[in-house]
């Protein structure tokens, strides 16, 4: 048997190991907890518990410490964090760290749990007032090396490079890198003993260390290479020419201070020494309690399954045999027909199997299948390659033969399949004449339904969160950028473990996620009855695509270009000079320096902003911002739609094929890309022109059906307000009825302006709009807007009562729900920052309505597609979904019966206390049908 035919044991954990045979005493490991705290917070997705407690930093920091325990068995390990309050550096320099923003609330909430876990792990935890964690680490490192003990400092802080010596090494577990003396020279171009002077020269904006103005790393290194140290640089400062020389001489008085601030102390007067810092026995009971509280599921399983759960020494705090990331896996590359037959037989007998395709492209219309992978049991998976065609590629089974053999299995609806984003696999297999059926589970959707905002829902992120594993990344085997290989070009010995791991991880993720869905029946119902049945519906819509008129778009694009040229000319005349309308820097100079317009808002760097909300405010009083806004709007339409849509017409079908995304938005709404249909303007003339380019094929019409005021109807249902319910039951114009109530006039006497104001109030309150926001929209004062809101709630008290109750529920539970039980978690609902809390409250009010609307349109899509597939396959096909609208291609002879059936099924998608009205239009293009 060749090496290729042998099972491959895939090891996915990269370890940093020191040669323990060269030293009798293991190194002391000093962990810079504060450094990892911030890095984990910013690097990892914003994970949360079911009660909305953030856990991203907890997971990140504890993962790093656990990895260090594995990599340095037997070593004394000490974890150091910064103390609250000022340090001696603030006494030296009052402005030290003065400009650093406060710690985010959702990070501050994670510090105590991290401290508790470190202590439960039996590790010494140090927090020393008056100094920083760096100084404590520097002092302990100095003590250890003076006793002949080597030191490993685990940190992500570049300042620590000054501690490196022949006996002190830095490691960064986030990047799996180590830095000894040679590493410092390689990274910085100078030795460890020069790092402090380097830091003094370049300064630190975050810590507010002055440094030398405009002196970057290259300049500092050049000076240090020439003159060795800061004192010599100061002595030779007159030899530095140009502006940078002036800056250096200006900084001479403050450079000693900068050096003092940058120097890590190695002589802190600690009340303890290394001898006093004892490792204790890990408290598994306490640790298990903490892991459960913060829902760290993979670690819970490790502790519960450990043979030594009652008595575990600090020296073997992490046992590889119980760590899912380090268990041996059997991944097989199948290149033998007999072995394939064996796997297919097993798959046919399995109640559920994980399935994945490897392809040549992420674009489903262009992708060819290179191989397929399967998993039935955790830790065992197979990859069947048949399309690797690089030079020297080993012999593989024939693609057509394999796919024909798999076709009955893959098309059997009774054979349950599990995958990660199976919609993509279904689309790709369709390119090869296979119609995937039996989609029983999808881990991407399981994760999304459990918590739409808690994590990214890609497999790599989910593996880290739920399994505690780092998967093999595509970039690690294919490379990056322009030179990245497609999967058919990747060496089979690398491609095999990667592909097999995909199936294995998917299976194990399902085993972790499905039980959580089962715990909450309503979430399980959302998954099983709404999101999962939608997968084949969206797949068929994507494959069908939509026809567009390239000539219509080209003509529109030319008109946009002409109008943009006119706007540019008008803007230049208004400004009194030519400038680039797309340059924020030039706009700042024109607006604020030349024209003296008021500064509404500044950028994070302190420059006057030219962002769209600022221009909208300025446009009320000034012509130039209005011209810029219109130019930007047309430029975006041109680049995003009129120029781009013709390029997206697929050569094989003559249609455009969008991609719908089920696991992106927080509320459950679908999003789309290539093209993004959701961003086509709804009410503007330019948006109408783009919709005119979506056309019906010969013999067909386009039918567009959408829900009338669905979110307001949902508000009436959820709030139970008698006034709103009555207005909808009577079929009244809800905006006219609201205007009559708010302005105290008869319905027949409502003016156009009053109706427009009432419409703004109706929709504004749904989105939690404040009096200030409503006033800006209606162009009235804040007091007047508040009066409108007060009158609205006087007339519709049930709405106010509902909003108050939903705010309270959000604060109590940390989430809100749609009518069908979909949850939206609100991590900032109890934030100390009032602005964040108020924003979360506005989301809490709107999310149940927007999310329920999303659930209803999804239910309608499944119902309509089932009806069309069963009764009208030749008469109509659903091709697009945008917001609350469905677009169908309908045979001209079947328009009336399809319209009747479509409106009936869409109206029946939900049972509300008010009628759910659907309006369907018909035309030769989308605009006519809209």
Task: Give the positions of each predicted feature.
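Short alpha-helix plus adjacent loop in nuclease-associated cores
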Residues: 95-109, 113, 161-190, 245, ...
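Extended two-metal-dependent nuclease catalytic cores across DNA- and RNA-processing enzymes
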Residues: 21-24, 47-48, 98-270, 464-466
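Conserved catalytic palm subdomain of right-hand nucleotidyl-transferase polymerases, strongest
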Residues: 151, 355, 441-443, 697-709
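Conserved "right-hand" nucleotidyltransferase catalytic core of DNA-directed polymerases
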Residues: 251-392, 411, 454, 462, ...
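Conserved catalytic core of nucleic-acid polymerases
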Residues: 485-488, 536, 540-543, 598, ...
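Conserved RNase H-like, two-metal-ion catalytic cores of nucleic-acid enzymes
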Residues: 22, 26-29, 33-78, 94-106, ...
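Acidic beta-strand-to-loop metal/phosphate-binding motif
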Residues: 78-82, 127-129, 152-156, 354, ...
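C-terminal polymerase-core module
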Residues: 562-569, 573-626, 794-842, 846, ...
């Amino acid at each position: 048997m060749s090496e290729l035919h042998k099972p491959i044991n895939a090891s996915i954990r990269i370890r940093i190991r020191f040669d323990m045979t060269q030293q009798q005493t293991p190194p002391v490991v000093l962990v810079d907890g504060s450094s990892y705290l911030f890095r984990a917070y910013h690097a990892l997705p914003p994970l949360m518990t079911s009660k909305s407690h953030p856990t991203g930093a907890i997971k990140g920091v504890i993962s790093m410490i656990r990895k260090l325990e594995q990599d340095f068995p037997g070593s004394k390990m000490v974890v150091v964090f910064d103390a609250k309050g000022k340090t001696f550096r603030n006494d030296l320099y009052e402005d030290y760290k003065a400009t650093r923003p406060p710690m985010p609330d959702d990070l501050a909430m994670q510090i105590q749990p991290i401290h508790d876990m470190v202590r439960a792990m039996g590790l010494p935890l140090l927090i020393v007032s008056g100094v920083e964690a760096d100084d404590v680490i520097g002092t302990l490192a100095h003590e250890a090396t003076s006793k002949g003990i080597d030191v490993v400092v685990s940190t992500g802080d570049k300042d620590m490079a000054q501690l490196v010596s022949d006996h002190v090494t830095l490691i960064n577990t986030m990047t799996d890198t180590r830095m000894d003396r040679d590493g410092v020279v390689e990274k910085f171009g100078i030795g460890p003993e020069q790092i402090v002077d380097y830091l003094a020269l370049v300064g630190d904006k975050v810590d507010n260390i002055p440094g030398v103005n405009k002196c970057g790393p290259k300049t500092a290194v050049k000076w240090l290479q020439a003159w060795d140290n800061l004192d010599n640089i100061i002595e030779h400062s007159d030899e530095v020419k140009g502006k940078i020389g002036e800056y250096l001489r200006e900084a001479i008085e403050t450079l000693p201070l900068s050096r003092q601030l940058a120097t890590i102390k190695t002589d802190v007067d600690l009340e303890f020494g290394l001898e006093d810092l004892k490792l204790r026995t890990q408290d598994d009971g306490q640790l298990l309690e903490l892991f459960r509280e913060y829902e760290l599921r993979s670690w819970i399983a490790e502790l519960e399954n450990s043979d030594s759960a009652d008595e575990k020494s600090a020296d073997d705090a992490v046992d590889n045999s119980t760590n899912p990331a380090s268990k041996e896996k059997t991944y097989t590359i199948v290149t033998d027909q007999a072995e394939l037959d064996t796997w297919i037989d097993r798959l046919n007998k399995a109640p559920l199997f994980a399935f994945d395709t490897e392809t040549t492209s992420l674009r489903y219309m262009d992708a060819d299948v290179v191989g397929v992978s399967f998993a039935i049991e955790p830790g065992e998976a197979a990859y069947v390659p048949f399309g690797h065609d690089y030079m020297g590629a080993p012999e593989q089974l024939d693609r057509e033969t394999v796919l024909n053999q798999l076709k009955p299995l893959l098309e059997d609806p009774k054979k349950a399949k599990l995958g990660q984003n199976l919609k993509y696999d279904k689309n790709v297999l369709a390119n090869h004449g296979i119609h995937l059926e039996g989609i029983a589970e999808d881990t991407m959707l399981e994760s999304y339904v459990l918590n739409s905002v808690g994590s990214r829902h890609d497999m790599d992120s989910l593996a880290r969160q739920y399994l505690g594993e780092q998967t093999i990344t595509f970039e690690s085997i294919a490379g990056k950028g322009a030179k990245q290989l497609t999967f058919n070009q990747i060496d089979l010995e690398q491609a095999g473990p990667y592909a097999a791991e995909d199936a294995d991880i998917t299976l194990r993720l399902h085993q972790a996620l499905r039980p959580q869905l089962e715990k909450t029946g309503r979430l399980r119902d959302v998954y099983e009855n709404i999101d999962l049945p939608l997968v084949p519906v969206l797949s068929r819509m994507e494959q069908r695509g939509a026809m567009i008129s390239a000539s219509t778009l080209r003509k529109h694009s030319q008109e946009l270009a002409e109008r943009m040229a006119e706007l540019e000319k008008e803007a230049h005349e208004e400004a009194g000079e030519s400038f680039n309308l797309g340059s924020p820097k030039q706009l700042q100079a024109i607006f604020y320096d030349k024209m003296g317009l008021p500064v509404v808002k500044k950028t994070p760097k302190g420059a006057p902003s030219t962002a769209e909300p600022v221009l909208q405010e300025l446009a009320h009083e000034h012509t130039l911002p209005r011209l810029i806004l219109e130019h930007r709007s047309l430029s975006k339409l041109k680049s995003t739609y009129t120029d781009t849509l013709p390029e997206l017409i697929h050569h094989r079908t003559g249609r455009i094929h969008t991609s719908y995304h089920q696991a992106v938005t927080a509320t459950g709404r679908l999003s789309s890309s290539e093209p993004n249909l959701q961003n086509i303007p709804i009410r503007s003339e330019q948006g109408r022109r783009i919709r005119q380019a979506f056309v019906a094929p010969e013999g067909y019409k386009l039918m567009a059906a959408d829900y009338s005021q669905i979110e307001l109807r949902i508000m009436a249902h959820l709030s139970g307000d008698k006034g709103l319910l009555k207005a909808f039951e009577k079929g009244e114009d809800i905006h006219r009825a609201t205007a009559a109530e708010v302005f105290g006039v008869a319905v027949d006497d409502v003016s156009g302006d009053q109706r427009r104001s009432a419409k703004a109030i109706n929709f504004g309150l749904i989105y939690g709009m404040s009096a200030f926001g409503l006033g800006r929209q209606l162009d009235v004062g804040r007091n007047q807007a508040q009066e409108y809101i007060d009158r609205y709630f006087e007339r519709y008290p049930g709405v106010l009562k509902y909003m108050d109750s939903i705010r309270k529920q959000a604060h109590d539970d940390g989430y809100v729900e749609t009518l069908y039980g979909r949850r939206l978690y609100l991590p900032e609902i109890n934030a100390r920052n009032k602005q964040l809390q108020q924003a979360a409250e506005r989301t809490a009010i709107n999310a149940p309505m927007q999310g329920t609307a999303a659930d209803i349109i999804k239910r309608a899509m499944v119902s309509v597609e089932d009806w069309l597939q069963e009764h009208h396959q030749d008469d109509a096909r659903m091709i697009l979904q945008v917001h609350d609208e469905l677009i169908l291609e309908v045979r001209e002879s079947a328009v009336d019966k399809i319209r009747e059936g479509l409106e009936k099924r869409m109206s029946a998608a939900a049972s509300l206390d008010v009628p759910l009205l659907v309006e369907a239009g018909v035309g030769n293009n989308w605009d006519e049908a809209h």
